[in-house]
């Protein structure tokens, strides 16, 4: 029978000092012996996805204490990728994931907490907490802040739906008036919550449902809706049950590594492919798998991407649907239900509710459920009122969207395409693979060839795009922006947005060893591995080289012979300690970022730290 970790600090005469300090936090004799559960919050006023979380930790803590546990709250940092984007701040975004994972480990292990409730929401916070959870392997429940309502405004007497990406694109579009640009900006992000499309934050919060570590509705129920409060209340109650199941009944099924096992990771990736999720999820799932010693690799993603159809199309791939529409159609459980009926899921998985996948779908898939409360929860809709407050409205859609032929979520027979929303490409330009969000690629661009325009920083690429130096048919190469070369693997949302602003969104390709925002669409290929800084062939591309992209065949190649590439490699090596670094880039890199770069692996490994360099 496992012993409560917290007993290390609460039992025994030699722990009198620790108990004295616990008493100073409000604990009493009656609390010593109860499970100490960490409420891992991520409230900050910097990030709209987290601005409403201040009181939600207290809400969870109250439920923990009422159920017989002791709750202790702490906060992690949270970076807003949208605010950090387009300048040096983006260098810090991906490295913050490791900082978050480490800070959770530090706090939980230093104080011997028995379990956790992770209150996350935005891009690197959910992955960082997920990595920590699998590293620590103590009972955990994820409950996120929820998605933002989609923006809505009238332009030319037409009501349109908006999100952050629209503000970025139209802000740089010379054909959009200042007045219209300002109106879009003011309307794009109307409420608290994670940005309203299938961007990285919402993708990851959906995947925690598929992994079995969060409750149904976690990924899609709006931040502003009163029903979301129930998820927080239930998380506080349920974590005490999970904790006691493990420590008092020796029930290993309560542990995250026994919930988020390989079959669950495959289900999460299948979901991601089916819903056209952010390419960043690939990076984060690979990283989380390594933390949990799960044998889940790029090869698995490639295999799955060839089998799974595209069942759910959401912004930025279409402006018709946002997360509020996914929720109305049944959310993650609705998509999983269609995948299950298509025979594509591993059914031998369980979750924090203690239910198998078939049991969960029977209760929470709106196409199967007879539970009126479940149906009502999926009818939770937007209010259209600007607010930063959680649970501030109780609006409902009049009906559910159960149209699996023409609705937001489709059955396999009526899929948007039989090819999934993400694909792994490989070839001489990406020998260890790269990722493209096929859900956002125009059908005419699935096979594309063109001359390379080579840039050694995102800034240079943006200047060239806005300066008219990139023309239709070009393949824009942005290199030395990988985990090591950036450092920090910047998101390339501004270059892709500006290609659209210049009318080139469907006329050019963009390839990078950096990554893309979940808001990216178009022929945007990222995570090229090995990255340029690790000697990847992307570092040998020269201006005018022809690049061939074939998404149906999963190929990406540089049309340059081996002899020429060998000569270019020799020229690189002749640069000595400057080899595999950008030639003319002016960039200030702090000590903290240099430390990150010294251990960073390429994207095909999840951009995690190279344990072999630490003797691990």
Curated annotation (Swiss-Prot):
Enumerate the residues binding [2Fe-2S] cluster.
122, 195
> Which Gene3D superfamilies did the record assign?
IlvD/EDD C-terminal domain-like (3.50.30.80)
Q: In which pathway does it act?
A: Amino-acid biosynthesis; L-isoleucine biosynthesis; L-isoleucine from 2-oxobutanoate: step 3/4; Amino-acid biosynthesis; L-valine biosynthesis; L-valine from pyruvate: step 3/4
Hey, what's the signal peptide range on this chain?
none
GO BP: any one term: isoleucine biosynthetic process
Which keywords appear in this protein's UniProt record, sorted alphabetically?
2Fe-2S, Amino-acid biosynthesis, Branched-chain amino acid biosynthesis, Iron, Iron-sulfur, Lyase, Magnesium, Metal-binding
Cofactor comment text: Binds 1 [2Fe-2S] cluster per subunit. This cluster acts as a Lewis acid cofactor.
What PROSITE patterns does the entry give?
A: ILVD_EDD_1, ILVD_EDD_2
Query: Where in the sequence is N6-carboxylysine found?
Result: 124
Positions binding Mg(2+) in this chain are 81, 123-124, 491
Question: How is this protein annotated for GO cellular component?
Answer: cytosol
Q: Which GO molecular function terms does the record list?
A: 2 iron, 2 sulfur cluster binding; dihydroxy-acid dehydratase activity; magnesium ion binding
Keyword Aminoacyl-tRNA synthetase assigned:
no
- What EC identifiers does the entry list? 4.2.1.9
Q: Which reaction does it catalyse?
A: (2R)-2,3-dihydroxy-3-methylbutanoate = 3-methyl-2-oxobutanoate + H2O; (2R,3R)-2,3-dihydroxy-3-methylpentanoate = (S)-3-methyl-2-oxopentanoate + H2O
Q: Does the keyword Methyltransferase apply?
A: no
Q: Where is the active site?
A: 517 (proton acceptor)
Pfam families documented for this protein? ILV_EDD_C, ILVD_EDD_N
Indicate the family of this protein: Belongs to the IlvD/Edd family.
UniProt-listed PANTHER family? D-XYLONATE DEHYDRATASE, D-XYLONATE DEHYDRATASE YAGF-RELATED
Q: Which NCBIfam families match?
A: ilvD (TIGR00110), PRK12448.1 (NF009103)
Q: What does this protein do?
A: Functions in the biosynthesis of branched-chain amino acids. Catalyzes the dehydration of (2R,3R)-2,3-dihydroxy-3-methylpentanoate (2,3-dihydroxy-3-methylvalerate) into 2-oxo-3-methylpentanoate (2-oxo-3-methylvalerate) and of (2R)-2,3-dihydroxy-3-methylbutanoate (2,3-dihydroxyisovalerate) into 2-oxo-3-methylbutanoate (2-oxoisovalerate), the penultimate precursor to L-isoleucine and L-valine, respectively.
Subunit comment for this entry? Homodimer.
Family annotation (HAMAP family): IlvD
The protein, known as: Dihydroxy-acid dehydratase
Protein's gene: ilvD
């Amino acid at each position: 029978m496992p012993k409560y970790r917290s007993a290390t600090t609460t039992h025994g005469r030699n722990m009198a000092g620790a108990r004295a300090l616990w008493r100073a936090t409000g604990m009493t004799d009656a609390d010593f012996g109860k499970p100490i559960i960490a409420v891992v919050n991520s409230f900050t006023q910097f990030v709209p996805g987290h601005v409403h979380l201040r009181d939600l930790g207290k809400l969870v803590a109250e439920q923990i204490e009422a159920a017989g546990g002791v709750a202790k709250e702490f906060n992690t940092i949270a970076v807003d990728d949208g605010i950090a984007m387009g300048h040096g701040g983006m260098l810090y975004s991906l490295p913050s994931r490791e900082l978050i994972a480490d800070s959770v480990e530090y706090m939980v292990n230093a104080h011997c907490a028995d379990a956790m409730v992770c209150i996350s929401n935005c891009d690197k916070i959910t992955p960082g907490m997920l990595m920590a959870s699998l590293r620590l392997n103590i009972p955990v429940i994820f409950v996120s802040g929820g998605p933002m309502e989609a923006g809505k405004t009238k332009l030319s007497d037409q009501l349109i739906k908006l999100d952050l990406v629209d503000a970025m694109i139209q802000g740089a579009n010379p054909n959009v008036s200042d007045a219209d640009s300002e109106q879009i900006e003011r309307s794009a992000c109307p409420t608290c919550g994670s940005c309203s499309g299938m961007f990285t934050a919402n993708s990851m919060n959906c995947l925690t449902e598929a992994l079995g570590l969060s409750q149904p509705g976690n990924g899609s129920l709006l931040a502003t809706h009163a029903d979301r409060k129930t998820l927080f209340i239930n998380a506080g109650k349920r974590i005490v049950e999970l904790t006691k199941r493990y420590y008092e009944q020796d029930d290993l099924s309560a542990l995250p590594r026994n919930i988020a096992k390989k079959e669950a990771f495959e289900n999460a990736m299948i979901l991601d492919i089916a819903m056209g999720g952010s390419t960043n999820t690939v990076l984060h799932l690979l990283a989380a798998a390594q933390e949990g010693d799960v044998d889940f690799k790029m090869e698995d993603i490639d295999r799955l991407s060839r089998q799974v159809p595209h069942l759910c199309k959401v912004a930025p791939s279409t402006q018709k649907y946002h997360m509020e529409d996914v929720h109305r159609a049944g959310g993650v459980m609705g998509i999983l239900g269609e995948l299950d009926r298509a025979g594509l899921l591993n059914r031998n998985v369980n979750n924090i509710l203690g239910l198998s996948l078939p049991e969960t779908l029977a209760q929470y898939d709106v196409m199967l459920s007879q539970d009126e409360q479940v149906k009502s929860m999926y009818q939770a809709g937007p209010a259209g009122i600007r607010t930063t407050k959680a649970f501030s409205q109780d609006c409902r859609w009049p009906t559910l969207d159960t149209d699996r032929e023409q609705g937001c979520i489709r059955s396999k027979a009526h899929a948007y395409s039989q090819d999934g929303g993400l694909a792994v490409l490989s070839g001489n330009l990406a020998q260890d693979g790269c990722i493209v969000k096929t859900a956002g690629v125009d059908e005419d661009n699935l096979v594309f060839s063109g001359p390379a325009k080579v840039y050694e920083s995102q800034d240079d690429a943006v200047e060239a795009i806005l300066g008219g130096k990139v023309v239709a048919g070009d393949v824009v190469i942005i290199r030395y922006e990988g985990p090591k070369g950036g450092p920090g693997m910047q998101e390339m949302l501004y270059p892709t947005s500006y290609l659209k602003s210049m009318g080139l969104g469907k006329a050019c390709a963009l390839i990078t060893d950096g990554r893309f925002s979940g808001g990216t669409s178009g022929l945007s290929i990222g995570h090229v591995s090995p990255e340029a800084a690790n000697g990847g062939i992307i570092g040998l591309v020269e201006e005018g080289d022809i690049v061939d992209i074939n998404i149906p065949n999963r190929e990406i190649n540089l049309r340059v012979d081996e002899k020429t590439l060998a000569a270019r490699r020799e020229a690189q090596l002749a640069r000595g300690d400057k080899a595999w670094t950008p030639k003319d880039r002016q960039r200030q890199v702090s000590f903290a970022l240099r430390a990150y770069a010294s251990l960073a692996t390429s994207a095909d490994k999840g951009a995690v730290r190279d344990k072999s360099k630490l003797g691990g």
